[in-house]
């Protein structure tokens, strides 16, 4: 089965809901839908599209044809900001390293374009013609990856903790625990944040605070692991972490993180988990993550 659908020329939220209904009817309830924002109506109705979707793709090629190209940069920034505030992943795509279809090295402007999308908060950058039909597909992938790694290294050293709009005042327990975990990990110098998760939701929330250490996430569901690949800073692993108790689950997750090399004996990690006996219910919804745990690895 597939993991994602990138839906072209989405104009409103209803179109996303129709795609989701088709997925569910055909056994694809875990398929994530990324509408491609590439027309004027998609921009105009963006808020309802974002509400209905699992993430967004900024498809700048057609968008720059459908609307004035000089409007694309600030629309891109606004879309990324809104996705960050909604804790939903965003992909920036099209013509990022376009000259590498014919040349082994990008222009400096293209390098800056990729880096600036990452500075703005994009979760992923995507190649299209460069890797699909270009003369240097492998070189293009390696170049984009190297730009991303260097940019993230700079952000880890210089950028402050990112707090999406409303996150510091929200009373949603999942968000509060996620932000607290990142604050603790940053303050104590933790080597990683360890996240046992069923659906990947907690990893997604923590991802959007942009911590400067890896988010080591474990799920027993392959579909959840595949989805978490798209989240900024998350290193997802397929593993049966859940034990009979919350403490047992946390200890198993930390031990697995140690085995994978994310944290060594004597170093610190912060783990999140959910204790179902004390889950907080508000407005008819359960907050599944209600524990943040500091541990020194043995």
What label would you give each PLM region?
Residues 1-298:
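Non-catalytic helical/linker scaffolds that mediate oligomerization, partner binding
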């Amino acid at each position: 089965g597939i993991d994602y659908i990138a839906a072209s020329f989405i104009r409103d939220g209803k179109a996303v809901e129709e795609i989701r209904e088709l997925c569910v009817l055909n056994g694809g309830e875990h398929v994530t839908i990324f509408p491609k924002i590439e027309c004027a109506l998609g921009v105009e109705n963006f808020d309802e599209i974002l509400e209905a979707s699992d993430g967004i793709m900024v498809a700048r090629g057609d968008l720059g044809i459908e609307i004035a190209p000089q409007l694309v940069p600030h629309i891109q920034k606004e879309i990324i900001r809104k996705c960050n505030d909604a804790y939903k992943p965003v992909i920036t795509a099209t013509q990022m390293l376009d000259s590498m279809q014919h040349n082994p090295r990008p222009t400096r402007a293209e390098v800056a374009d990729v880096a600036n999308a990452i500075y703005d908060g994009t979760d992923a950058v995507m190649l299209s013609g460069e890797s699909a039909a270009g003369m240097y597909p492998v070189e293009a992938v390696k170049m984009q990856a190297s730009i991303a790694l260097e940019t993230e290294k700079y952000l880890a050293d210089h950028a402050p903790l990112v707090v999406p709009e409303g996150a510091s005042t929200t009373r949603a327990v999942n968000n509060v625990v996620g932000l607290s975990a990142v604050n603790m990990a940053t303050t104590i110098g933790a080597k990683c944040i360890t996240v046992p998760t069923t659906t990947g939701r907690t990893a997604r929330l923590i991802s959007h605070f942009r911590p400067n250490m890896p988010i080591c996430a474990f799920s027993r569901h392959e579909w959840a692991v595949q989805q978490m690949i798209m989240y900024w800073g998350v290193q997802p692993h397929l593993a049966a972490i859940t034990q009979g108790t919350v403490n047992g689950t946390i200890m198993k997750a930390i031990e697995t993180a140690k085995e994978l090399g994310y944290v060594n004996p004597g170093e610190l990690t912060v783990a999140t988990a959910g204790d179902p006996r004390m889950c907080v219910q508000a407005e008819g919804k359960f907050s599944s993550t209600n524990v943040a745990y500091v541990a020194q690895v043995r």
